[in-house]
Amino acid sequence: MSHSDYTRRKFLQHTALGTMAAALPGFTLAEDRPINDRPDPAFKPDVEVELTAQIAEVSILPGANTRVFQYQGQLLKGPSHSLKTLPGYLGPILNLEHGQKVRIFFYNKLSEPSIVHWHGMHVPQKMDGHPMYEIYKGERHVYEFEVENRAGTNWYHSHTHEMTAAQVYQGLAGLITVTDAQEQKLGLPSGEYDLPLVLQDRRFTAGNQFQYGQGMHQRMMGFHGDTILVNGQANSAIPVKSRAYRLRLLNGSNARIYKLGWDDGSPLTAIGTDGGLLERPETLPYIMLAPAERVEVWVDFSGRKPGTELTLQSLEYQGVMSPMGGRMGRMGMMSGLAPGASFPIVKFQITEQVSDSPSLPNQLVPIRRLTEKDISNTGKTVPIAIGMRHMSFELNGRTFGMHKRMDIEKIPVNTIQKIRIFHDNQMMGGMGGMGGMGGGGGGGGMRGGRIGMMGM
């Protein structure tokens, strides 16, 4: 879609932003859009990265290459490990440290608007990749923030209004890892023994091109693919040594929920989730992972002989709710590989016997326990009702408005609030905005027939 297709709409949408943008350092106005295209000279970054969204062609399946959207990265300043490129089409991994100051220059070389959201990172509002800050082809946006997160796994992805799900499906996503002093004392597996695993399911045309949801219903409700990709690659097999590894798993799928388990029935050992490292390791028979969720798993291949394999799979499960209510059996939601079916995800092939391996700590990091005494809004719980009407998702009965908010949605910064989040119908979706990858509607119209959830 061309730049001119948005001019009238954006003029009406962003007129009110002029005064605000002029007051913010580094912000300029482009057709009454707030564009943060200049670095703040007072901000002294420890890490500086250039990130470019562009079209690329990559080999995923045998035969023709697949056309994708891709983040290309370049490290301008900082430790060499701050940026790590993965094979496949996903963006580079950003490896950051607590307390670092980070500057990222985002360039858009796509023919449609885009903006980047740092999912799970604690950053100022104007650095979070809100859709109001989207940029067009040939423009740039400058992000500057200090890393306040504790050690854990996060990610970044497109956050363009009504295009989020489609752009992520095409490839605009990547991992972020954060480390801190507490984590470094634990001696967890690192370097080549710290493995990122981005799980995605995709549909392909006969010509090996991504096939995004067909029709309004699939784009609104999400859909399942029939090919499982790990780090952008099909039929994934990873060579490992007979020692302990740290697996960082992200569900980057459109709508699929995985029930993670080992093919030999061994339990899983979780050491971290979306919020970071756990207080202590948790041993579980399986782990459910919804779209946008992350989990960190400790796996020890010690005692396994070279030539053997261990497969991480999605175990069979029942009881999936269809988007319009009612239970589903083994028929897929919007076709594709059936939800709840059992299938392999990635094989780990033991190729080398080694004797040195770290031990799993009994304790990881202390976590402060919150109580009712910590809450600032005692007796005034904030309600967030998730619903749907007229094919648009709603929060508290309202569709998304770029600059509109209810009084109850204004939360004082640095306070602990009690919030009740609930569904007022039977729609399915994970926390953190899923729908998010599930293609849920941001509310009020479409761009080119593609709808994306705003809650990511």
Question: Model-derived features: where do they sit?
Answer:
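N-terminal secretory signal peptides
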Residues: 1-10, 17, 21
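Hard-cation-handling environments
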Residues: 314-315
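Histidine-centered copper-binding motifs that mark active-site loops
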Residues: 4-6, 15-16, 29-302, 318-320, ...
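A Trp-anchored, charged/polar loop motif used as the substrate-binding/catalytic surface
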Residues: 229-233, 400-405
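Extended hydrophobic-aromatic, low-complexity segments
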Residues: 258-260, 308-311, 321-323, 393-396, ...
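C-terminal substrate/ligand-recognition segments
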Residues: 383, 388-391, 404-435, 455-456
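Long intrinsically disordered, low-complexity regions that are acidic and Ser/Thr-rich
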Residues: 434-456
